[in-house]
Regions:
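Short, structured segments at the rim of ligand-binding sites
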Residues: 1-419
Length: 419
């Protein structure tokens, strides 16, 4: 199992480009099932989760090629197998995103109940209940979801709770449904807007993405398109925190700052100096001058749960005390035990982590438990005294493209160790 070796103490400086957003790309890849025509993707990140989705589509009969411009071209016109098998689905919860597309276009889907990060319960009930309202028949058999429908029929759906993948799955199902579908209490994440823009570029009729209500007028078919994956706001936020905690000066290019206001506002409160350009963000911070900032996660436009672990590290290095509250997922403080092994002073009580700033950390062997926990351990290693070895880094490869290369380019002493 590969590991990352980090020797802390180096200030990060320089400019790097942000990769395409995994959380935007995955539903778009699932949506390629909705058309017979070719889809071309630019700026698709090279990540394990993307590879897993490729494997799922490929196992169904999709054709995936790479052109001379490094764009991915996908054709699902020859799909003949409508099953997403457990051996592929078990590593990634987003695998369920193929459910809506398969039922909408082919009338049948057999999807293994999903796996992914072990950060709490993320039920698929919202997906299944909404598909049932659209006219699908749902059965759970031997760990698989089986969905059938002759033709989905538009209707009003009020989600009982906010679900990003639930919103995306039903959007994809509804674009080919007969009549109008109105989705209420939907997720407002930028990636939901990205999916709507992508589907509309294929000929869908979707309005309201980014608000509490999405209106979808079904169409008979969708066409091919060319689409560039927007920048990953969570990757960008992670590198900005890395710059802040090392007392660095880093510029990120290919980034959309308006999507990151909730992150940037907290970084400013922590003492960072931030300059925003048309498609870039520059952050500088004096080492040792971090101010504590309370964090409370919430669905967009609130503070993203996917940045909670990174800001826990920032607060651990601050001058003062703070409270980090996790409102989105339970059991998402598994990184705390490992951070405390490096010298952090963090106490978890229920959904709150009480963080006392310690000023400095010490390198140690640590083990990643999920994607964002992996990122927090790497961040801690960047500013710790001595050597940190991060084990089980397959988690980080699910969501960060070439993280050791990008950090090395900025001046970090970080090396990937082979098995």
């Amino acid at each position: 199992m590969e590991k990352l070796r980090i020797v802390g103490g180096n200030k990060l400086s320089g400019t790097i480009s942000c990769s395409g957003a995994k959380n935007a790309a995955l539903p778009m890849l699932a949506a390629t099932i909705l058309t017979d025509e070719q889809i071309t993707f630019k700026n698709l990140p090279y990540l394990q989760d993307i590879t897993t989705m490729f494997e799922i589509l490929g196992s169904m009969g999709a054709e995936i090629t790479l052109n001379e411009c490094m764009d991915f071209i996908i054709s699902t016109s020859k799909i003949h197998d409508f099953e997403a098998r457990y051996e592929l689905v078990k590593t990634m919860r987003a695998s369920i995103l193929v459910l809506g597309s398969l039922v909408a276009r082919h009338g049948f889907a057999k999807i293994a109940l999903p796996g992914g990060c072990a950060i709490g319960t993320r039920p698929v009930d919202f997906h299944l209940d909404a598909l049932t309202k659209l006219g699908a028949k749902i059965e759970l058999k031997n760990g698989y979801i089986e969905a059938t429908a002759k033709k989905l029929i538009g209707c009003d759906i009020n989600f009982p709770g906010v679900s990003v993948t639930g919103t995306e799955n039903i959007m994809m199902a509804a674009v080919l449904a007969k009549g109008q579908t109105i989705l209420r209490n939907v997720a407002k994440e930028p990636e939901v807007e990205d999916l709507a823009n992508f589907l509309n570029s294929m000929g869908a009729k979707i309005n309201g993405a980014g608000s509490d209500e999405i209106i979808i007028d079904g169409v008979n078919n969708l066409n091919g398109t060319k689409f560039s994956i927007p920048a990953d706001r969570i990757e960008a936020g992670t590198y900005l925190v890395a710059a802040a905690i090392t007392g660095g000066n880093v510029t990120l290019s290919n980034v959309q700052a308006p999507r990151m206001n909730n992150i940037l506002d907290k970084l400013k409160l922590s003492g960072a100096s931030i300059n925003i350009g048309k498609d870039n963000i520059q952050l500088s911070m004096n080492k040792g001058s971090i101010l504590p900032v309370d964090i409370s996660t919430a669905p967009f436009p609130g503070f993203p749960t996917d940045m909670q672990a990174q800001f826990t590290v920032l607060n651990a290095l601050s001058k003062g005390s703070s409270v980090v509250t996790e409102n989105v997922f339970e059991n998402r403080f598994m990184h705390v035990q490992e951070l405390n092994r490096m010298g952090c002073d963090i106490t978890v009580k229920g959904s709150n982590a009480f963080v006392k700033g310690v000023g400095s950390l010490n390198g140690a062997p640590v083990m990643a438990t999920d994607l964002r926990a992996s990122a927090s351990l790497i961040l801690a290693g960047l500013c710790a005294n001595g050597e940190t070895i991060v084990d089980r880094i397959y988690h980080i490869d699910r969501g960060y493209e070439r993280i050791e290369e990008k950090l090395s380019y900025l001046g970090a002493d970080i090396t990937r160790l082979p098995n």
